[in-house]
């Protein structure tokens, strides 16, 4: 990652291709969250996913180094000069959305974020939380999500994103009921 930042002086952050201890690649290159993305993430089926394909937060795993909106923080390198300019991590976030917010602030300051496929890192997920499988979304994730939307888009947008999330979930459940 350091080599990438040294050869790309206009890049603010660089992150690795990440895979699990089972060898499976993880989706760690993302678009910024949006109202449309919230709806698609919950509805998650054919026509809706197709309609919002360019809004889906988790991008397909890139096979080449590419600029992205944000990266998973499990393996990310950033320039000190960028942090001096935009500030450090917002400590209000807990485990989720902090790197999303940081990359967004960098992007608005003119510093792109690159996914560097040549840098490869094994990530053993859920060690910090002890939750391999989520039975339900934890409160700290919801708190961080709400803080992200409110901080970066305002209370009205955060409310609309939440309503969109709920509407997508209702549509998904209705689809399951009809199919069964």
Specify the residue positions occupied by each region the protein language model found.
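Structural signal for membrane-spanning alpha-helices in multi-pass inner-membrane proteins
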Residues: 16, 41, 173-176
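Short, flexible, basic/aromatic active-site loop/helix in glycosyltransferases
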Residues: 33-69
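Conserved donor NDP-sugar-binding/catalytic core segment of glycosyltransferases
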Residues: 1-31
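A short, conserved alpha-helix in the catalytic core of glycosyltransferases
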Residues: 61-63, 67-120
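Short, hinge-like loop/turn segments at secondary-structure boundaries
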Residues: 29-35, 132-133
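Residues that scaffold the ATP/ADP-binding catalytic core of kinase and kinase-like folds
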Residues: 28, 38, 42, 85-86, ...
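Active-site-adjacent helix/loop segment of glycosyltransferases
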Residues: 104-179
């Amino acid at each position: 990652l350091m080599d990438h930042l040294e050869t790309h002086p206009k890049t603010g952050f660089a992150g690795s291709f990440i895979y699990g201890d089972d060898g499976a690649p993880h989706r760690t290159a993302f678009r910024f969250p949006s109202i449309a993305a919230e709806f698609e993430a919950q509805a998650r089926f054919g026509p809706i996913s197709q309609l919002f394909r360019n809004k889906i937060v988790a991008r397909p795993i890139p096979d080449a180094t590419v600029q992205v909106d944000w990266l998973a923080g499990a393996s990310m390198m950033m320039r000190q000069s960028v942090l001096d300019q935009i500030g450090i991590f917002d400590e209000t976030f807990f485990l989720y959305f902090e790197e999303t917010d940081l990359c967004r602030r960098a992007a608005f300051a003119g510093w792109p974020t690159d996914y560097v496929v040549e840098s490869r890192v094994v990530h053993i997920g859920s060690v910090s939380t002890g939750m391999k499988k989520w039975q339900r979304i934890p409160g700290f994730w919801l708190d961080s999500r709400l803080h992200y939307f409110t901080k970066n888009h305002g209370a009205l947008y955060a409310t609309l994103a939440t309503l969109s999330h709920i509407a997508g979930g209702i549509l998904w459940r209705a689809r399951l009921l009809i199919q069964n």
